[in-house]
Amino acid sequence: MPDSWDKDVYPEPPRRTPAPSPQTSLPNPITYLTKAFDLLVDRPVTLVREFIERQHAKNKYYYYHREFRRVPDITECQEKDVLCMFEAEMQWRRDYKVDQEIVNIIQERLKACQQREGESHRQNCAKELEQFTQVVKAYQDRYHDLGAHYSARKCLAKQKQRMLAERKAAKEAAAA
């Protein structure tokens, strides 16, 4: 086949897409809109932000988390000491949130190990699974079935009921 062919005999097939005609009588309105947005919105916002960042760079303020001292447990409060009971309640709520975070962290570690190990996760993640089961059991022993209106008093009553049930089970086991 020769390098050049006779274009009169074998014309080129027509293109499927029409050739763009860059010559139009009207300018593109999108160009004007983007320039107007840049001038009216983007540049002033950028200038204000850069100014604020420079001011913040001059005056650095360091944020630290708040540390609460431990307060007495609700069992150590006097009967009419409302302030002590309130502090004990707030301490219990902080402990509750900390325990929730501990369970979440251990669960994330277990999930990461299972993801990393794939099919052999039962064998290779046994330590993480054992730790997770211990943490979840301790969490459920303390906080399970408290309901939506949980409090330190309800938790203490639940703990008392659990201790009484354990004593009763121990007596029955000793008698049998």
Swiss-Prot record:
It comes from Bos taurus. The gene is NDUFB10. It is found in: Mitochondrion inner membrane. Belongs to the complex I NDUFB10 subunit family. Pfam families: NDUFB10. InterPro entries: NADH_UbQ_OxRdtase_su10, NDUFB10. Its main location: mitochondrion. Residues 1-27 are annotated as: Disordered. Keywords: Electron transport, Membrane, Mitochondrion, Mitochondrion inner membrane, Phosphoprotein, Respiratory chain, Transport. This is NADH dehydrogenase [ubiquinone] 1 beta subcomplex subunit 10. PANTHER family: NADH DEHYDROGENASE [UBIQUINONE] 1 BETA SUBCOMPLEX SUBUNIT 10, NADH-UBIQUINONE OXIDOREDUCTASE PDSW SUBUNIT. Residues 1-15 have a biased composition (Basic and acidic residues).
